[in-house]
């Protein structure tokens, strides 16, 4: 048997390990704040166009919470977090469940469609180039804008309805969560350059499963397990070109009234 994997076999291995990472709580590296969630961070502290700042200690973003240590849980509770808003898909939640005493998990399901798209390519024996993989990710972000607005609307409404600190997350805390953070910061008046800075922090913080190292096509894995400005730009372009801009998108597809936007800003901004 040849020791060199055929292209379709190698890509199938890539997808297999992606799905494994989506559905397992084990983590390879210790993060700076939470040992079991390397991409956990406060979305507060950023300046707005109106001269205010996003309040710290009220909203946090993260990768999944299924691998938290007892110390992590204690830290989460010390932060006052009472709700976790979970964007993971059905299989992810089933395979990697969590229950944290005193923290209510709210399911805001968005399936990881890029995995399904890659599986289709595997079935066709196709190995996408770096450019094609980037294009797949950009398509995923456009789908967030055009096909998942209802879910993101529920996310924003939940932030409005619950005054206590909350954390929102998906599996890696980079794509579904990254767009959610971009929406929230946009609603609060943070400029896009600053939003992009927050978005790209994932590349410094997120530690993927060590079993993924060396698996599949490196050029595919590099795209799938990092964030790139092009991904976020694709979402913003869809907002601008198909929905008339962020203000219209927030008040249209997302479903926030001007009064609700003002209340969100009152809750989460400070002088």
Language-model features, listed with the residues they occupy:
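Cys-dependent protein tyrosine phosphatase-like superfamily
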Residues: 2, 11-167, 179-271
């Amino acid at each position: 048997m040849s020791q060199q994997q055929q292209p379709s076999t190698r890509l199938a291995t890539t997808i297999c390990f992606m799905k494994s990472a989506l559905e397992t709580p084990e983590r390879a590296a210790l993060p700076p704040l939470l040992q079991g969630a390397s991409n956990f961070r406060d979305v507060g502290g950023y300046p707005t166009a109106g001269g205010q700042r996003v309040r710290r200690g009220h909203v946090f973003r993260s990768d999944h919470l299924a691998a938290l240590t007892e110390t992590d849980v204690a830290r989460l509770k010390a932060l006052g977090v009472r709700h976790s808003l979970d964007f993971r898909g059905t299989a992810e939640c089933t395979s990697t469940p969590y229950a944290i005493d005193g923290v209510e998990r709210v399911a805001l399901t968005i399936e990881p469609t890029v995995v399904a798209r890659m599986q289709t390519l595997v079935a066709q024996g196709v190995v996408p180039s770096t450019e094609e993989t980037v294009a797949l990710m950009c398509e995923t972000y456009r789908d967030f804008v055009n096909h998942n607005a209802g879910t993101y609307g529920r996310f924003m409404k939940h932030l409005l309805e619950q005054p206590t600190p909350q954390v929102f997350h998906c599996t890696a805390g980079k794509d579904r969560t990254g767009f959610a953070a971009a929406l929230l910061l946009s609603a609060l008046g943070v400029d896009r350059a600053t939003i992009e800075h927050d978005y790209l922090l994932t590349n410094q913080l997120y530690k993927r499963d060590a079993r993924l190292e060396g698996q599949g096509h490196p050029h595919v894995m590099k795209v799938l397990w990092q964030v790139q400005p092009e991904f976020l730009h694709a979402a913003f372009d869809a907002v601008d070109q198909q929905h008339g801009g962020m203000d219209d998108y927030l008040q249209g597809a997302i479903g926030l009234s001007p009064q609700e936007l003002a209340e969100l800003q009152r809750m989460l901004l400070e002088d």
